[in-house]
Amino acid sequence: MEEIKEKLRAFIQERFEIDDDPDFTDDVHLFNEGFVDSFGAVEIIHFIEQTYNIEITQKDITLYPMNTIEEIAEVVENKLS
């Protein structure tokens, strides 16, 4: 799962221009802390689907919290297994 988190972290940092912010960690709430907005969430899901050739459904979004890099990586890992 560490590789998934690294890819997510790198994508989010590059796409949303997050420099070496000490508050940007794997367990920070990306939305509440203002790192990502709702449009950004769509971009993250698109990145995941393209990178891992999986589909993130509306059901996934409803059932599983995906507010942190840790939570998103868990969903991806579960979809891959």
Describe each region flagged by the PLM.
Residues 1-21, 74-81:
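Thiotemplate assembly-line natural product biosynthesis machinery
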Residues 61, 70-76:
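C-terminal structural segments of small proteins and small subunits
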Residues 39-42:
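Short alpha-helical elements of helix-turn-helix
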Residues 67:
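Residue-level signal for the nucleotide or nucleotide-sugar donor/cofactor binding architecture
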Residues 15-35, 53-62, 80:
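Phosphopantetheine carrier-protein modules
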